[in-house]
Structures are given as structure tokens and as C-alpha cells.
Amino acid sequence: MERWSINDSAKIYNLNNWGGDLFSINKKGNICVHPSPNSKYSIELASLVDDLIKRKIKPPILLRFMNILEGRIASINRVFRNAIQTNNYPAQYQTFYPIKVNQQRQVVEAIANFGKKYNIGLEVGSKPELVAAISISTNNSLPIICNGYKDTEFIETVLYATKIGYNITIVIEKLFELEKVIELSRKTGITPKLGIRVKLSSKGTGKWATSGGEDAKFGLRISEIITAIDLLKQYNLIDSVKLLHSHIGSQVTKIDKIKNALIEGARIYVEMKKLGVNLEYIDIGGGLGVDYDGSKSSYFSSVNYSVEEYANDVIYQIKNICDEAGVDCPNIISESGRATVAHYSVMVTNILNTNTQNQMPDFESILTQAEPLSPTVRKLVDIYKSIDRHSLREDYHDTLQLIQEAVSLFNLGYLNLNDRAMAEWLYTRIIKKINNLVEKMKPVPEELQNFKLSMRQTYFANFSLFQSIPDSWAIDQLFPIMPIQRLGEKPDVIASIADITCDSDGEITSFVGENGRTKYLPLHKIRKNEEYYIGFFLIGAYQEILGDLHNLFGDTNAVHITFNKKTNYRIDTVISGDAIQQSLKYVQYDGNEILKKVRDSLENGVASKKISIEESSHFLELLDKTIQAYTYLGE
């Protein structure tokens, strides 16, 4: 038997490259989570999940590791502080969390609390987000930046909140917004705090590149900025403008694109200062990416730079332009939401079943039987018996032709169902035999390099792709996925992961592998009476809030966990996932009304003797219990 170690498992899932030293495999072959990079303290995920199940918290379970969240906030601020010291930068850095990345109250409150020492702020882009941010701001102390489209109600809310002491900046995205702000400021007599968003010609890279450039949805063109400055001077509001904002898109994969945007933004800052705008801040927006696949490349699921390089370039480029122009350096703001929250959240769920070939009928006897077989089946038997590495390529091509021939003959009525089943069984046996031979070949012939895909099985996991990791479906985003146990054993199956929705799109067929993106996930055969769990990692950004109710699968159970030196971990908060009753309510069904209608039908059934009173009572109890149950599958 081939020896296998936990290091081999770490390698095939590329764990050490995407894990950021926050995830490791222990000697038992189980995934562990660390509160900070290289910490000696850890939580074993498999044991944690077992403990949660004992507490009646069922999978799928979203695990939020609050120490990791705190550590990410500290890490981003630390690297900027170091960059400021290294470059002798004369101003400050400030983090703002864009709450659109994850608006869950417990998450935003935790970020605000962890970030107090760094004077962290919140960025909002809608009226609901504004109200949420105001509610989080204890003693009006939390700075808030308002981006996005704004109507009269939005602007008035900000103005009156400003009057009572809230620190809120309105960022002007369009000229009509500025006109509205001027009008409402004069009407209320309240002077606003203002910023201006510029539409840079520089673009980002990857899926969100269109957030930048001259065709971007938001921001003022250079000519519009000149108009805005004139308007602000005309109405004596020019001194209210303290911030220049730009954004070239989320998950910018190439550092050179970031540098270009920084240079352009800094030049605009310098020129606006020369025009009499007393700017104090540059808000460089988001874009700091996450290395989801661990490749450290410019592929859209990765980045070709570190957080340290990013911070150093931000500080250096802005300082260089300002020093050259003889202009005071601004305080710097970034809105790095993805990089802040991606790592702290892991979803774990159980595998329900597989479509493994082992469930096929056993036709072993046909390999030795002398009785007549159909010519197609007989040829497949001959290939299976004779195949070796010398005839591999020819036998592979012949096998593909024969299985297609079997389907055609069946459709024409020349093969019966049993013959077709025999052909399928032989095909899978031949493919397995070829796979064993291919694994020993060096080099592998070109047409056999993707051969493994024909061996791929489907593992059905207890989750909804559309609810828990919608970006995997919507934009083909890669997320690290791997088993959380048995990592001291060599995987003996390659698989795709299918969810439990009634949708053929609910399947993951792209994974993070040893050499980048791969079309299969190495897994282990399922053992009888033993749960097999997989983890979905780096899903803290956007996934919860973008998830939808496809097939009415609702929010999963969520658990907030902190590390504890005495007991290893502490469960701080448990947020129950949606019950069926809640999911039905979202689409205007009432659980009590449903029960009433069914009760009426049952009474009619009892009266007409279609069902007994005992059966009627049992069914009503069952339906009531079902309506109150978790939307995901149990036993």
C-alpha cells in the first residue's frame, strides 16, 4: 500500500498556500483552525462539529472564528503602520469596512468593536446600510462614509445625524447629487461633510475591472470635478470637501494596476489642492485581493502581491507624488472589506451520498462465462482482459467507440436493458484499469492528460450552492474546498460536489488543486455508519449576503467561536438557521394557514373514510414538525 502523509494532503489541496498559516492538518489527519498565523493554539474542526451536533446544531454550519476577524483587522493596520514608518509618511492610515461585504449585525458590531483602537470606520452604499451603521455607532463616534446613489431622504438623514454629532461624510458620485446636497444644506442650515468620487481612467483586473475606467458606473469625470468645485465655491461649501475617493474594483489581481490608479488619484488630489480644495483624505477604495487558490498569480482567484507590498506601494506612490508637487500628504483611507472578512468564515457540511460506480450491479461472471454475449459486450470483455500499457491508447479509443455503439444499438432496439447495463459496467472497469496504468506513465500522452475526468464521481453535500457560496455559481469564483478529516489517508476518489437543490447548476466542478485550478476534488470513499465532512473556506466576503432562497433552502446555522486557552474554544453566539416556516414566510406563505388548510382536508378525509383518525393525527403532527424544522436535510 502506498504511504501517505498529512503533508501529501496539504500539497494536493494547496493548503499551505491559501491557508495563510491559519489552517493546518494535525497528526490525527484533521483540519485545525488557528486564531492567528502560526499560533500554537488551534481548534480541530472535526471535534468542533461533533460537539456542535451534540448541542443539536446540525450541518450545514457556518463557523465564524472571531479571533481571525480581529487578527485580520490588526494585520492590515499593522502593515500600513509599518509602511508609514518605513517611508516616513507624515500622515495617518484609517480602515473603513464596507458593510455590503457582510452586513450581518453581529459581524459589523464585532468589526466596530475590534477596530476601535484603529479608529475603524464603516462605508455604506444605501439607506438601509446607513441606518444600520448609525445604529452601530456608539456615542456617535464611529466614522461613516456614504457612497452610492442618494435621494433626498438619504441626504437629509445624514445632515440631521451630522447635526447631533455623527461623523458622516457624503461622497458625491454624480453632479445631481451635489445639487441636491447644496439645496438641502441651505434648506436645513446644516453644513455637510463632503467627499468627491473621481472616475479614474485606470482600470483594475479580473471580474470587477469595469468598476474603474471612464465607463464606470460611479464617480465624476475630470470635467465634472471642475464644475463641482465651481458650484461648491459659489455656495460657500468648498471647505466642506475633505475627501477624494476612487475605486477601481474588487479583487484587483495585479499590483501594477493598483500602482497606476494610485498615481492617477494622487495627481488629481494634488491638482484639486492647487484649485483651493482643502482635501485632507484620499480614500483609495477597495481592491486589496485575497489569494483564494494560493497560486500568487494574476489569475482572477488570486493576487500577485502581498498585503505588505500593497501597503508599501500605497504609501510610497502617494508620498512620491505629493512630495514632488510640494503638497501636504493626505491621510489615507482604504475600504478593504474582502481582505478583512474572507478568512474568518468556514462552512462545514456532511456528504449525504455519492453516485459511485460501486452501486452498479455485479456482472463479474460475464468475464468468464462461455454463453453468447452481444458482439459489443464481447468486444468490451476482450479489451478488459487484454489491456496493457502498450495498447493503452488504442484500447481507450476503442472503448469510447464501443460504449457509444452500445447506446446507439439500445436506442434502435438491438440491445436489451441488461446488455446495456453490462456495457456500462465494463466501461467503468476498463476506465479504472486505464487510470491505474496512466498514473504510472511518464510522460502521459496528450489525449490522456484529462483522462481522470472520466473517473470523476459526484458527492452530494447537504447545502445549497446558491445560498452558501453563490459566487461559485454566478461568476465561477474559486473557493478552497477539502475534507476536514481522514487527511492522513490517501484519497481514493476524484469527485465533483453537488448540492441538494433541484438545479443542474448546483454543482461545483472547479477546485483549488496542487497546481492551480482543477476540475476534480480528491476525496475518500464513504464508510458505512460514519459521517464524512467537507469544509468550504475563505467564504466570509459577500457569500452570506448574496445567497438566495433557491428551492427555499434558507440561511444555515451560524456559530461564533473564540479561542480559549483553558477549554480550547468558547461558543459566543449561535444563530439558528432558517426553519421551513421562515423560508415559506419570505415568499408569502403562512405556516398556520397551511396547517389549517391541511387539517380541513384531513377532516374531510376522515369523514369519507379515506384516512383513519390516527393516521390523520399522525400526519398533522408530522407536518407541524416539518414546518418548524431546519430547511436542510437530517437523517
Curated annotation (Swiss-Prot):
Q: Which GO terms describe its biological process?
A: arginine catabolic process; putrescine biosynthetic process from arginine; spermidine biosynthetic process
Q: Which reaction does it catalyse?
A: L-arginine + H(+) = agmatine + CO2
Q: In which pathway does it act?
A: Amine and polyamine biosynthesis; agmatine biosynthesis; agmatine from L-arginine: step 1/1
EC number(s) from the headed UniProt entry = 4.1.1.19
Entries under CDD domains matching the protein: PLPDE_III_ADC
Fetch the InterPro entries from UniProt.
Ala_racemase/Decarboxylase_C, Arg_decarb_HB, Arg_decarbox_C, Arg_decrbxlase, De-COase2_CS, De-COase2_N, De-COase2_pyr-phos_BS, Orn/DAP/Arg_de-COase
> Keyword set for this entry?
Decarboxylase, Lyase, Magnesium, Metal-binding, Polyamine biosynthesis, Pyridoxal phosphate, Spermidine biosynthesis
Bridged cysteine pairs (disulfide): none
N6-(pyridoxal phosphate)lysine is found on: K100
Its required cofactor(s), as named, are: Mg(2+); pyridoxal 5'-phosphate
For the keyword Methyltransferase, the answer is: no
Tell me the residue numbers annotated for binding substrate: I282, D283, I284, G285, G286, G287, L288, G289, V290, D291, Y292
Q: Name one GO molecular function term.
A: arginine decarboxylase activity
Q: Which family does it belong to?
A: Belongs to the Orn/Lys/Arg decarboxylase class-II family. SpeA subfamily.
What is the documented function of this protein?
A: Catalyzes the biosynthesis of agmatine from arginine.
Protein name per the record: Biosynthetic arginine decarboxylase
Q: Which gene name does the record give?
A: speA
